[in-house]
């Protein structure tokens, strides 16, 4: 999702100055971390199928901004035509942005940067236009998992609905910040009434709606907000 979004924006932004595929680098977390592996594998699968992008190199930065900053500086010198930077976290995207500005680049114009997590600094950078996109929402999975455990302990087995869930992340771009920012700002753990997801507490529910879309109506929010 994030990689495709960066490529689509790159094709739009640099169409007059492009000769060949867009050059991209990726900065991932700790190479042995499950989240890092999953996100990087998704990126590689996408890059292999889209001939409009050339994934130059993937480097680890251990989820640290300063490591991402140093890594970007080295790779930008190695690949001067670099246009797209995919990072596995908003924290590392912040390091890339800092490095780019030190190199007299203009993130959001000369360079399209994306990250993951909906971290506060990432959303701020998206709002400012320095980071084009942030993918996130996976922090909700902990609450949803707790709902399943609660229901099971109350005698409401969830096996018939599946034993494995992988929720889709949401995406916010700088280009649609104005129309979506209010909803994204509301999607915080303290604003969500997880009790409303429980099929034990709400036997009228036929299934579990563990999705970001479920939050749009306000039904699952505290006080319906």
Provide a role label for each language-model segment.
Residues 28-38, 90:
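Extracytoplasmic "Venus flytrap"
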Residues 23-26, 44-65, 108:
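Short beta-strand elements in bilobed, periplasmic/extracellular small-molecule ligand-binding domains
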Residues 43, 60-124, 146:
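Hydrophobic alpha-helical
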Residues 1-9, 26-28, 58, 128-139:
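Short beta-strand elements at the ligand-binding edges of bilobed clamshell
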Residues 1-22, 67-68, 117-122, 138-154:
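Hydrophobic alpha-helical segments within soluble ligand-binding/sensing domains
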Residues 23-27, 56-57, 83-87, 112-116, ...:
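Structural recognition of the beta-strand scaffold that forms the well-ordered cores
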Residues 2-6, 34-53, 95-99:
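Short, solvent-exposed amphipathic alpha-helices that sit
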Residues 27-31, 144-225:
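Hinge/cleft segment of the Venus flytrap/periplasmic-binding protein
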